Amino acid sequence: MKFLAITLIVHRPDPVTGIRKPTRDRFREVLDNALLAEELGFDGFGVGERHERPFISSSPPVVLSHVAALTRRIRLFTAVTTLSLLDPVRAYEDYATLDHLSGGRLELIIGKGNGAAQRELFQVTPDDQWERNAESYEVFRQIWRQDKVTAATRFRPELTDAEVWPRPYQQPVRVWHGSATSKESVDLAARYGDPLFSANVTHPIEPYAELIRYYRERWEHYGHDPGALAVGAGSAGLYVARTSQEAVETYRPVFEGTLAFQRQAGLPVVFETVEDFVERSSALIGSPQQVIDKVHRYHERFGHTVLHVHADASGLTDPRHRDSLELFQSEVASVLRKDIPDPPFDWGPVLPTPSTTEEPAHV
């Protein structure tokens, strides 16, 4: 099993202290967490993309380029790239550049994105967001694979023998499809034979397990090799301590502060107490053995081989945040790496393959 640390770069008051850091300090914290993730042996570091409050993750290629300059080994993920909002040509240019600067460490998780405010900002409607996502991905995918692209697009100017530079480092970059609530992204992933990354954050296990089951069904429908299928999954929170009692009591003020924010913002509340959150959500809060057991329970339902945890302290003090990550790596990840297999591909740059025959995009 491989392990990622991911941030959406939420920028709001600390759920425990009520203090909001200056924007510059919040970005510095992201960079520090990326360095910590590499130091502790995480396999990847991811940055989300949101274009509305309370997030400041509107430019993941810029942030990841800085992370690439500071690190040497860790793979760099987007989580997720909101292709339904983006011009696929510009998205390709940004990420192909980042891929070169990082020496082929880039992996993308793509999706339509969430939030009404960012849809309004980019004039994307709920009715066309899935079509935009599919069209943008097909064009993006072809640009990465072909020197010239022709595409009869609906949501951007058509392309005719278009050349887009720089040509890529990885051939091709690995693209995962983020999945949260709907079957459209799952089917898109299965259609192209791409890996799936389940959000697995907001709700109990059942809806996510059903979408992963559907992904496997569609993967088979499209005739792909069952042995090449790969699934990743997120987690709703992380705090590992020596005992379950210590973990829950330390995390309690973090949970209660976050719950208060959700209620103030009018967001739906799924878990009313920290005990319910620990029991029924995907949060990894407890002793090392409890966390190991919980990941195994989820693996039995998902069959996932990649797991992401929160990169941010999210209300924990910096020493407790570091102690938790260190304990996770030394006593949890070390066991799970042996118990659960890796994804069915090399964890490194995708080597060049012979050029494919140019085909027009059917969008």
Question: Model segments located where?
Answer:
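Active-site mouth loops of central-metabolism enzymes
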Residues: P13-F27, T81-V89, Q171-T181, E279-P288
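N-terminal beta1-alpha1-beta2 module of alpha/beta enzyme domains
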Residues: M1-T71, R75, Q171-V173, F345-P352, ...
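Alpha-helix-loop-beta-strand connector modules within alpha/beta enzyme cores
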Residues: P54-T78, R132, S136, E326-I340
